[in-house]
Amino acid sequence: MKVNLPAFERAGVMVVGDVMLDRYWYGPTCRISPEAPVPVVKVNTVEERPGGAANVAMNIASLGANARLVGLTGIDDAARALSKTLAEVNVKCDFVSVPTHPTITKLRVLSRNQQLIRLDFEEGFEGVDPQPLHERINQALGSIGALVLSDYAKGALTSVQTMISLARQAGVPVLIDPKGTDFERYRGATLLTPNLSEFEAVAGKCKSEDELVERGMKLIADYDLSALLVTRSEQGMTLLQPNKAPLHMPTQAQEVYDVTGAGDTVIGVLAATLAAGNTLEEACYFANAAAGVVVGKLGTSTVSPIELENAVRGRADTGFGVMTEEELRQAVASARKRGEKVVMTNGVFDILHAGHVSYLANARKLGDRLIVAVNSDASTKRLKGESRPVNPLEQRMIVLGALESVDWIVSFEEDTPQRLIAGILPDLLVKGGDYKPEEIAGSEEVWANGGEVMVLNFEDGCSTTNIIKKIQTESEK
């Protein structure tokens, strides 16, 4: 079923708030330091990702919406890294440079899929003149459909009331991811998106959903809000609006690896969906689905339109789906960061039979994720003859995607998937039949990358060709 996503390409969103750079150092841990009882990490991979308000803007841009980012930075390598990375994903940056302060940076050291320590490099921007931020907001109000204020209490949003007033006067909704217990600062906002802990720190501990709703409605009245969305981790999220019944949405997360940046994803998808012209209820629906995807990834991350589409169909990227090559490469990269072993196989899979099902189940048991590469219709004709395939590519991929053993499906146009395999480089390449490992397309590339190649047996008596012959014979009787 095709899911109608919002018209993100028509949506314009400005994000104003605390901009930061998230750095990740990865490496193996093999010993304890002789200097202190701490592990020694041999760093072999370094990543830099936009965090805080910058991650919100990334999430908006990843959906195909027009994202503008305003915030405070220093004049340093971190600011340059942020600008470069954000420009690459089409986020329009308009930073206010403060030469007396460093750009806020958070460094995480990870090993064996565990975060060992986080180091923060920052000085609060409190006291910095907010007027340049106000000017940037004023200039953009005529071309945006939503304003996001991303508050991490680092000093960029000391004049929240002025920012809310500017936007509301222009008829632009204001969405705020709050910080701290002083919700008076956010009076008059269109929507606040606290998590449950943040909400209860202001409203008090809630023993039931009824109590949460009652206290949430009181907050809406006390602070003149248009709506309140409480994100509740494994309990999903709850939308509260005056004169409307509460909307409780269960979580769609299938696997949770890291909640870092999940709130950024939620408010980013909310803003982009509202700016595209959808209702708040629809925006919450898409945001809930996106949150279920992003918590299955390690570190601050974003959600693509195809991932969102799969998620609202109940098929999040952490599990299954038909993908393009680029989407598959991203999914494999995320899986590897989680320490998962990726297995890949290929074939026509024209009329799926018990032999195919058994073979794919056995291949899946050899790792954590199974990719199935499928010959296109043209490729199948060249390989099998003009009468094939019996089932077109789209139908073959849909049937494969229904198997529990199959995680990702991708098609290829060539006679063999050698180019595709060389681009993915699975940990294990599997082929069924009487092949020798060295005869399998892509084997040399996989071996050169340190991977494995294996041949599995097909179930005796199962053959698409035999099935077709039997059908033809029966029809001739």
Curated annotation (Swiss-Prot):
Pfam family, one: CTP_transf_like
Membrane-crossing segments per the record: none
Annotated segments matching region Ribokinase: 1-318
Cellular compartments per GO CC: cytosol
Reaction equation(s) it catalyzes: D-glycero-beta-D-manno-heptose 7-phosphate + ATP = D-glycero-beta-D-manno-heptose 1,7-bisphosphate + ADP + H(+); D-glycero-beta-D-manno-heptose 1-phosphate + ATP + H(+) = ADP-D-glycero-beta-D-manno-heptose + diphosphate
Pathway participation: Nucleotide-sugar biosynthesis; ADP-L-glycero-beta-D-manno-heptose biosynthesis; ADP-L-glycero-beta-D-manno-heptose from D-glycero-beta-D-manno-heptose 7-phosphate: step 1/4; Nucleotide-sugar biosynthesis; ADP-L-glycero-beta-D-manno-heptose biosynthesis; ADP-L-glycero-beta-D-manno-heptose from D-glycero-beta-D-manno-heptose 7-phosphate: step 3/4
Region (Cytidylyltransferase): 344-477
Source superkingdom: Bacteria
GO biological processes: ADP-L-glycero-beta-D-manno-heptose biosynthetic process
Active-site annotation: 264
Disulfide links within the chain: none
GO terms of molecular function: ATP binding; heptose 7-phosphate kinase activity; heptose-1-phosphate adenylyltransferase activity; phosphotransferase activity, alcohol group as acceptor
Its EC number(s): 2.7.1.167, 2.7.7.70
Residue sites binding ATP per the record: 195-198
Keywords associated with the record: ATP-binding, Carbohydrate metabolism, Kinase, Multifunctional enzyme, Nucleotide-binding, Nucleotidyltransferase, Transferase
Alphabetized HAMAP family for the sequence: HldE
Function: Catalyzes the ADP transfer from ATP to D-glycero-beta-D-manno-heptose 1-phosphate, yielding ADP-D-glycero-beta-D-manno-heptose.
Family label: In the N-terminal section; belongs to the carbohydrate kinase PfkB family.
The protein's assembly and partners: Homodimer.
Name of the protein this chain belongs to: Bifunctional protein HldE
Underlying gene: hldE
